[in-house]
Amino acid sequence: MKISIIITAYNVDKFIERAVKSVLSQTYKNIEVVIVEDCSTDNTKDIIEQLAKEDNRIKIVYHEENKGAGWGRRNGIEASSGDYFITVDGDDWLDEDFIESLVRKAEETGADVVSGGITCNKEGGYWEATCYGDVVCDGEDKVLKFWGEKIVFMNNKIIKRELGIKVPYCTRRFIEDTPTIIPILWHANKVAYVSNVGYHYRDNANSLTHQANAFKYALYRGLCSLDLIDFFNKNDKSILEKLPIQSMLQQQLNIIKQCKPSVEELNKYISDWLEFSKRILL
């Protein structure tokens, strides 16, 4: 079983070498590494090109303009050749046995998706590990368990490539994980979990998440809610009735009203704001 490791890289010159070397040093050896260089303005491009010269398992995909993580993942998957893929952010890293533990579970269960846990590494050395346990889910539990654990995270999973190609990727620049991973889980034959927490997520103070204000959070959570409502209305209304997505959407609408965003604030996100407004009115 070949695993493609898709690394999205944008202005992560302080972290990208650790990310790449952590995947190259995996105990599971049947891998390829696809790095998507998203028009960085720092030294990221130079670093990954040097790493690619040193290891022929690395393939670099270049964007002609900055497109964000959603596009990066999609283009990386299309350029990959593995049976399964995993996505890794350029400022994160993996423990050396992480991929092997997921592959072992995939071979044991035949699951289209196998998820590990995550370790959230914060500034100052503080960290927190979270995992789902060691279980296999099918039917509606594929989505309900994932949602119930409240860890909406895409990068700690190996996903069958044909499934990743099948599902449209959210290409917005913020809160893009959820509208993608939920449909992937729904389409999967089954979803398996392992207790390995070897995906290390760096809680970076300079990330887009930390730069968001209340209006931006509410806008993109609202768009995410609309995406999921549309998906389940088309595919599985019974699950939609069991998830709090409608109430989540209403909550975001209330926050937006309370924020009373200025024209200047709206103009920062004008295309997404117009999309949100149009979809709410329909």
How does the language model describe each region?
Residues 85:
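Short aromatic/hydrophobic "clamp" motif used to bind/position activated sugar donors
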Residues 90-192, 202-216:
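Donor-binding/catalytic cores of nucleotide-activated saccharide
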Residues 17, 42-51, 73, 93, ...:
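Acidic helix N-cap motif at the loop->helix transition within catalytic regions
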Residues 111, 258-282:
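Membrane-interface aromatic/basic loop that binds lipid-linked glycans or pyrophosphate carriers
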Residues 37-46, 65, 89:
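A conserved acidic beta->alpha catalytic loop
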Residues 1-3, 24-35, 43, 56-59:
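Short loop->beta transition adjacent to catalytic acidic/histidine clusters or analogous donor-positioning motifs
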Residues 63-80:
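Glycine-rich, basic loop-to-helix element that forms the pyrophosphate-binding segment
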Residues 12-25:
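Short, well-formed alpha-helical segments that are part of the catalytic scaffolds
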